[in-house]
Amino acid sequence: MITDVQLAIFSNVLGVFLFLLVVAYHYINANTGKIGPKAK
């Protein structure tokens, strides 16, 4: 059975991963919007 400590570690790792994924998505989305019109 999974313990409380294992569940806490798993949820923290998952939360950090999702947060970094959202930050990376916004960073890429913002940069591609600025680079696109300049290239044309």
Curated annotation (Swiss-Prot):
Cytoplasmic side: 26-40
InterPro entries: Oligosaccaryltransferase, OST4, Ost4p_sf
Transmembrane segments: 5-25
Entry keywords, A to Z: Endoplasmic reticulum, Membrane, Signal-anchor, Transmembrane, Transmembrane helix
One Gene Ontology term from the biological process aspect of the record: protein N-linked glycosylation via asparagine
Domain of life: Eukaryota
Compartment(s) of residence: Endoplasmic reticulum membrane
This protein's record includes keyword Nucleotide-binding: no
Lumenal side stretches: 1-4
Record's GO cellular component terms: oligosaccharyltransferase complex
UniProt membrane topology term: Single-pass type III membrane protein
Pfam families to which the protein is assigned, alphabetical: Ost4
Protein family (similarity comment): Belongs to the OST4 family.
Job of this protein: Subunit of the oligosaccharyl transferase (OST) complex that catalyzes the initial transfer of a defined glycan (Glc(3)Man(9)GlcNAc(2) in eukaryotes) from the lipid carrier dolichol-pyrophosphate to an asparagine residue within an Asn-X-Ser/Thr consensus motif in nascent polypeptide chains, the first step in protein N-glycosylation. N-glycosylation occurs cotranslationally and the complex associates with the Sec61 complex at the channel-forming translocon complex that mediates protein translocation across the endoplasmic reticulum (ER). All subunits are required for a maximal enzyme activity.
Subunit structure and binding partners: Component of the oligosaccharyltransferase (OST) complex.
Protein's name according to its UniProt entry: Dolichyl-diphosphooligosaccharide--protein glycosyltransferase subunit 4
